[in-house]
């Protein structure tokens, strides 16, 4: 005989209209001072409407909030992103999106631990390298890719020319940030970013993009807070 099936019921606390909805996953992570960048940095308003939020604005808001919450405790910033480009290197966003995140990371007081999981391409690799020195890391099978900005410009010749000048200016800024974060010579960085340069985590350590390769959270300089 089949046993009767009974539904598992949660306790009821007051009127349904006053119930507190369960927190979403990003909010739970933020409570533990964890930020996750898991998509490209789009600049298109149409894409932002489809996604439902502005990735760059969200990351910056989280960084600023965590400093306000506690300016002494570290922030853990996980990165799995192609930055402002697709896997092919074709532009889908402006480099200024990544510059804004890098500037905010340097502006705030808490140490920022950057950890690559999966991949960090182009401007995402720049963000990865912008963590607090000694606290930049990657999981063992991630990929770090260097490449330079592309125009992706369309329209009239004058518009393309204006965009091309902006791309060159952004490239110089990007090389300056990489040089500051890695200690590499800007001329070498210019050569290495001329084409896509794929690196293993060990190679990224040697290059100065990160400081260590992690096998587990125990390898972090400071332990991650546990979920309660």
From Swiss-Prot:
GO terms for molecular function: ATP-dependent peptidase activity; ATPase binding; serine-type endopeptidase activity. CDD domains: S14_ClpP_2. GO terms for cellular component: cytoplasm; endopeptidase Clp complex. One of its GO terms (biological process) is protein quality control for misfolded or incompletely synthesized proteins. Coiled coil: none annotated. SUPFAM superfamilies: ClpP/crotonase. Signal peptide: none annotated. InterPro entries: ClpP (IPR001907), ClpP/crotonase-like_dom_sf (IPR029045), ClpP/TepA (IPR023562). Pfam families: CLP_protease. Belongs to the peptidase S14 family. Has lost the two conserved residues (Ser and His) proposed to be part of the active site. Therefore it could be inactive. This is Putative ATP-dependent Clp protease proteolytic subunit-like. It comes from Synechococcus elongatus (strain ATCC 33912 / PCC 7942 / FACHB-805) (Anacystis nidulans R2). The lineage of its organism: Bacteria, Bacillati, Cyanobacteriota, Cyanophyceae, Synechococcales.
